[in-house]
């Protein structure tokens, strides 16, 4: 599931300058959507590239006129209506103005906004979810229980967006009933809280890999080859690197160049990944040849515990360098190998931690990621392929 962060920036937030500061902070932090009033759409679009959702009053004639001029990516009904309690809920939802608006052909809104005051509004939110692409729910007195109920009942009918005020609230919403909300609507002016919420979103979307140790069975000099350094647009931590190897089923953990040495400065944005033929793991679970990498591509950063995140390639630097062939054997006797540059700055991960490839010896245990699948054009497939 891809999670999203929405930022509330309508007239309830304050005057335009206040809303503008909030929206700008959201764009800089990397939120996915801003929720604004219809009259703000044009000037919000001038602030930067962002998905814009706009409250609409639900009048079909006004909506049709607005649709011709508006640049909103989605329209939301419910503000100043039944959804936020301005208009009383009808005893029979078949008479609901908000639901009727959502059911219109043509210029119908894309989503509904509901404040959960009690069980009646919870039921109303469920009815909205049956009609809307996006269902935004704001818990007034209770937050977790109504959200749990809606997650259990709504399923995949709609993108369920839960109102929150902090990053920790967002984490709870994302984790509720394990499935969690599809997104959160954040209501805060705190820049740090906006950034932390985006970080929580990213964390929730990260893959966690099972890494294991394989025994080094051979390490030998092989002469020169075209070696690739992957220079990313991200700074990596001391325990981070990438998964690379000659065989997609068995990839070696290679550390980023974060360590200082007397002879060369650290390059914490770089992984010296090996020869051009090798694979590197990508965020979608596939692989790419090192020779194919170019600026703008996505690669997967992984730490020694298997936690992952994405990074953008800024540059792939190819140079002829002397190489080592590193061969290892997994617990189930599968042989894997790769070519790594013969240099002290290239570090793999052994039971002793960061270890220079020049210090590796047969019998050492080296950190890898092993899968019982082959790849075809970078996609995992169930097929018998011999690689040697």
UniProtKB/Swiss-Prot annotation:
It comes from Haloarcula marismortui (strain ATCC 43049 / DSM 3752 / JCM 8966 / VKM B-1809) (Halobacterium marismortui). Transmembrane segments: none annotated. The gene is aroB'. NCBIfam families: PRK02290.1-1 (NF002623). This is 3-dehydroquinate synthase. It is an enzyme of class 1 (oxidoreductase). Belongs to the archaeal-type DHQ synthase family. The keyword Transferase does not apply. Pfam families: DHQS (PF01959). The lineage of its organism: Archaea, Methanobacteriati, Methanobacteriota, Stenosarchaea group, Halobacteria.
């Amino acid at each position: 599931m891809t999670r999203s962060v929405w930022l509330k920036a309508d007239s309830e937030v304050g005057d335009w300058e206040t809303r503008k500061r909030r929206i700008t902070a959201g764009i800089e932090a990397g939120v996915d959507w801003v929720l604004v009033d219809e009259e703000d759409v044009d000037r919000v679009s001038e602030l930067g590239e962002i998905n814009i959702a706009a409250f609409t009053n639900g009048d079909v004639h006004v909506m049709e006129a607005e649709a011709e001029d508006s640049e909103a990516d989605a329209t939301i009904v419910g503000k100043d209506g039944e959804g936020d309690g301005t208009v009383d809920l009808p005893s029979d939802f078949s008479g609901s103005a908000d639901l009727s608006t959502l059911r219109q052909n043509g210029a119908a809104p894309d989503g509904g906004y509901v404040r959960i005051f009690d069980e009646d509004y919870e039921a109303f939110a469920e009815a909205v979810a049956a009609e809307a692409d996006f269902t935004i729910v704001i818990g007034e007195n209770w937050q977790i229980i109504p959200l749990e109920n809606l997650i259990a009942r709504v399923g995949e009918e709609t993108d369920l967006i839960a109102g929150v005020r902090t990053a920790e609230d967002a984490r709870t919403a994302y984790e509720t009933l394990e499935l969690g909300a599809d997104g959160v609507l954040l209501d805060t002016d705190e820049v740090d809280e906006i950034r932390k919420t985006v970080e929580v979103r990213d964390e929730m979307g990260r893959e966690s890999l099972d890494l294991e140790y394989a025994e080094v069975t051979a390490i030998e000099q092989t002469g020169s080859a075209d070696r690739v350094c992957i220079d990313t647009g991200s700074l990596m931590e001391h325990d981070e690197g990438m998964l690379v190897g000659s065989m997609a089923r068995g990839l070696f953990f290679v550390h980023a160049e974060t360590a200082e040495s007397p002879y060369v400065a650290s390059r914490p944005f770089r992984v010296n990944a090996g020869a051009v033929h090798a694979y590197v793991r990508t965020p979608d679970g596939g692989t790419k040849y090192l020779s194919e990498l170019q600026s703008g591509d996505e690669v997967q950063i992984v730490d020694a515990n298997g936690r992952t995140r994405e990074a953008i390639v800024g540059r792939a630097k190819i140079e002829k360098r002397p190489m080592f062939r590193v061969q290892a054997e997994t617990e189930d006797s599968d042989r894997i190998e790769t070519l790594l540059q013969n240099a002290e700055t290239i570090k793999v991960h052994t039971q002793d931690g960061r270890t220079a490839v020049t210090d590796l010896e047969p019998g050492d245990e080296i950190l890898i990621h092993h899968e019982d699948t082959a790849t075809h054009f970078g996609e995992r497939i169930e097929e018998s392929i011999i690689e040697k």
